[in-house]
């Protein structure tokens, strides 16, 4: 099985398991609640991102993903990272309004998973050729979510199968988008060690 097929099979399996329990949403995993509102938010290169230092990692990730600026302009629509007690450090509220997208969470963990949900709502072109996208319309909605399981892991056996560094980076990125929080990396098998280290034989 090729590296690409492994990722495709993993995503296919997750999707079908979700369908088995009545899943009917493009958000994986299905959030605790999702309420649609009237109106749309227009995401473009002019959209600004507003955040405090507590949410810098998630905000910078989103900025790089969308390839937009982080300066505040009162005349443009905004994505705001805001603190709110959720009673779960990985929980979040994603509020998409006509003029603003508000991401509420207790800390950077919850904000990061909110960004992954927002990422899933965007067309696949954002994952590849962002430069071709001038503007995208997001329906107004409020999404609330928190993980049902504290440990959410995925395994990758590199002792029996060889993978490139680029593949492993993409694999971890896919796990993050699906809100896994643990990467179980099977590195050794008997005398085998699969990470190249120039200093040691």
Task: Describe each PLM feature range.
Residues 1-3:
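N-terminal secretory signal peptides that target proteins for export/translocation
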Residues 6-18:
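Sec-dependent N-terminal signal peptides
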Residues 16, 20-152:
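Acidic, contiguous N-terminal accessory segments
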Residues 56, 112, 162-165, 194:
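Loop/helix-junction capping segments adjacent to catalytic residues or to phosphate/diphosphate-binding pockets
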Residues 147, 191-201:
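Aromatic- and acidic-residue-enriched carbohydrate-binding clefts of CAZyme catalytic domains
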Residues 152-161, 195-199:
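Enzymes and membrane/adaptor proteins characterized by extended Gly/Ser/Thr/Asp/Glu-rich
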Residues 157-190:
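A conserved hydrophobic secondary-structure block that centers on an alpha-helix together
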């Amino acid at each position: 099985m090729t590296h690409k097929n492994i990722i495709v099979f993993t995503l296919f399996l997750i999707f079908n398991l979700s369908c088995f329990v009545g899943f009917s949403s493009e958000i994986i995993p299905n959030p605790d609640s999702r309420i649609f509102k009237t109106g749309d938010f227009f995401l473009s290169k002019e959209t600004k991102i507003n955040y405090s230092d507590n949410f810098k990692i998630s905000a910078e990730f989103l900025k790089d993903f969308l390839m937009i600026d982080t300066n505040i302009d009162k005349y443009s629509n905004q994505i705001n990272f805001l603190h709110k007690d959720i009673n779960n450090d990985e929980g979040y509220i994603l509020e998409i309004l006509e003029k603003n997208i508000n991401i509420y969470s207790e800390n950077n963990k919850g904000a990061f998973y909110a960004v992954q949900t927002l990422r899933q709502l965007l067309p696949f072109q954002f994952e590849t050729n962002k430069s071709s996208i001038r503007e995208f319309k997001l329906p107004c909605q409020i999404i609330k979510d928190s993980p049902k399981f504290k440990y959410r892991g995925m395994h990758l056996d590199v002792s029996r199968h060889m993978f490139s560094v680029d593949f492993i980076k993409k694999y971890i990125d896919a796990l993050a988008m699906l809100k896994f929080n643990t990467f179980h990396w099977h590195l050794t098998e008997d005398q085998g060690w699969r990470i190249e280290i120039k200093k040691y034989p």
